[in-house]
Amino acid sequence: MDFLTNQNIVFYLLAYLIGSIPFGLILAKTFAGVDIKSQGSKSIGATNVLRVVKQTNPSLAKKLGIATVLLDALKGTLVLLVGIYYGVTNETLWAIAVLAVLGHCYSIYLGLEGGKGVATGLGVYIVLIPYSTLIGAVVWIVCAKVLKISSLSSLLGLIAAVISAIFIYNGLGINSNIPMYLIAFIILYKHIPNIVRLIKGQEGKVI
């Protein structure tokens, strides 16, 4: 099967192992001396980096938050771009994308714990469904400005990206939307605690 060639297996391993790198945790420990795994939401994502570091150094918190978003997004983007360079199939690219997000959310370096996948999902979506990702990003920015709730804004942006992709990229070039839905499901699943707090009106404003 072309899907399981030696070259593709290398890409799958790279996608998961690079996706597993907890950049938020590394940046917060290195530059702010804090362990975000034991504070705030205990997530390794940019929102928790911002939340925790902001308590002692607001200006540094913004810089580290931005750096975390960029690095987490690049975890997915770079492996996909290398895969495109080597001419792997669309099926393989989507498998790489799913594994990169899984790596971030269930990091092998953190005992299969991790972040919530938003930035890494953004990184893979922008390569594979760019127009829909831009639509989702616009929705996220508008909601963030109005609602000032990171989790809700991220989820609304994700939903907008997926719905628009159904019309713009239906089939994803592989006659199936399943990989896109799977990435969205992983991100939504990791946000269940946030969704529960939103329903109860207890979700804090971070943005």
Curated annotation (Swiss-Prot):
User: Source organism's superkingdom?
Assistant: Bacteria
| GO cellular component annotations of the record | plasma membrane
Catalytic function, reaction form: an acyl phosphate + sn-glycerol 3-phosphate = a 1-acyl-sn-glycero-3-phosphate + phosphate
Q: Give the primary localization class.
A: membrane
Give the Pfam families listed for this entry: G3P_acyltransf (PF02660)
Q: Which pathway does it take part in?
A: Lipid metabolism; phospholipid metabolism
Give its localization. Cell inner membrane
GO process annotations (BP): phospholipid biosynthetic process
UniProt keyword terms in alphabetical order: Cell inner membrane, Cell membrane, Lipid biosynthesis, Lipid metabolism, Membrane, Phospholipid biosynthesis, Phospholipid metabolism, Transferase, Transmembrane, Transmembrane helix
- Give the enzyme's EC designation: 2.3.1.275
GO molecular-function terms, A-Z: acyl-phosphate glycerol-3-phosphate acyltransferase activity
Q: How does it sit in the membrane?
A: Multi-pass membrane protein
Residue ranges crossing the lipid bilayer per the database entry = 8-28, 64-84, 92-112, 122-142, 154-174, 176-196
The record, for PANTHER family, names:
GLYCEROL-3-PHOSPHATE ACYLTRANSFERASE-RELATED, INNER MEMBRANE PROTEIN YGIH
Family of the protein in this entry: Belongs to the PlsY family.
Q: What does the function comment of this entry state?
A: Catalyzes the transfer of an acyl group from acyl-phosphate (acyl-PO(4)) to glycerol-3-phosphate (G3P) to form lysophosphatidic acid (LPA). This enzyme utilizes acyl-phosphate as fatty acyl donor, but not acyl-CoA or acyl-ACP.
What name does UniProt use for this protein?
Glycerol-3-phosphate acyltransferase
Instruction: Report which gene this protein is encoded by.
Output: plsY
